[in-house]
Amino acid sequence: YILSPWQYSGMYQGLLSNMFLIQTRITWRDQSPASQDKTWKNEASDIWFATKTDEFLFKQHPVGVNTIEVPDVSENDSNLWIDIPKNLDEEGHYPRGLFTKILEASSFKLNWVLDPFMGIGDSGVACKQSGRRFIGFETNKDHLLLGMKRIDNS
């Protein structure tokens, strides 16, 4: 999964499609504080879901060429996510519910989750709270230390 503001979404689609199979682009309603745009208020960001093969995990069920069972995709499983509220008391950049929804769709408890651009640890906090193991990398030392503290305290 790659989270992206709309300005960079096309670039990520091009990069991902060179090495991965893009399964879907999720558009979610980003209810962050008002932007400084002089035109339309932007409330949408993209999440790119790509896999290395056509065989992957979705909603705790395998999907792919050698699977018999097809996962039940209900009305709630749309690629338009408008149901994730922004909690103003959270310390992170993204709502925790966003990561929780992704983790529940694509992993089991005790699975490892890798975030090579962990920032201040939003994905690590969600992993810890949902029973996943986490590995994160960050080049900014201040962000790394803040992220480690947030994950430890969650």
Segments predicted by a language model, with ranges:
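Core catalytic lobe of class I
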Residues: 1-146
